[in-house]
Design a protein with these regions (language model features):
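Short beta-strand scaffold positions
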Residues: 78, 97-100, 116
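Acidic catalytic patch
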Residues: 49-50, 71-92
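Short, electropositive alpha-helical surface patch
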Residues: 56-72
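Mid-chain, well-packed structural core segment of small domains
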Residues: 95-104, 111
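Alpha-helix capping/helix-boundary segments
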Residues: 10, 50, 83, 101-102, ...
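Acidic, PIN/NYN-like endoribonuclease modules and their adjacent C-terminal/linker elements
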Residues: 3, 11, 17-27, 92, ...
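PIN/NYN-family metal-dependent endoribonuclease catalytic core
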Residues: 5-58, 76, 139-145
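Short amphipathic alpha-helical segments and helix-helix/interface helices
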Residues: 30-35, 66-67, 103
């Protein structure tokens, strides 16, 4: 079964302004991915960091909507000392602390793909793919690739 880690940018995307084509298409891709996780075709992995980052969303209505998407997860990863240590290594690649923790959790969970809509993160890791144990991709690009196979 395909194991998928969505960062909080992805989980927020369906609630962003969908009048922009990119946002609308990414939202549709994310909702399709979540539907496949709900149907049991794929497995959604979340982490303690996912919940901590969602807790920082200032708008309570949005926070509850994003939190509701977590209900379909199949695996929950707690942060331990090995994840913290790995996150510090990932931060040396100029990756922000929360992003590094997400990536370290995804690596420890042995996910098949880590999805994010964060272009800055994707650019940083594209220069350092060799140093990571998980593939990071934009959800629209990845879903298009998977569907066309």
């Amino acid at each position: 079964m395909m194991k998928i880690y969505l960062d909080v940018c992805c989980l927020n995307r369906p609630f962003d302004d969908s009048t922009q084509d990119r946002i609308r298409l990414e939202s549709e891709a994310i909702l399709t991915i979540l539907e496949r996780c709900l149907s049991g075709n794929w497995s959604l992995v979340i982490s303690e960091i996912t919940e901590a980052e969602i807790d920082r969303i200032p708008n309570n209505d949005r926070k509850q909507k994003v939190r509701s998407l977590l209900l379909i997860h199949r695996e929950y990863r707690m942060v331990d000392t090995s994840i913290e240590k790995r996150a510090k290594e990932i931060q040396k690649l100029t990756v922000k602390a929360y992003d590094a923790l997400h990536i370290a959790c995804a690596e420890k969970s042995k996910v098949d793909i880590f999805l994010t809509t964060d272009d800055s993160l994707l650019n940083k890791v594209s220069r350092n793919r060799h140093a990571l144990k998980v593939r990071l991709e934009n959800p629209l690009k990845w879903l298009t690739e998977v569907i066309s196979q």
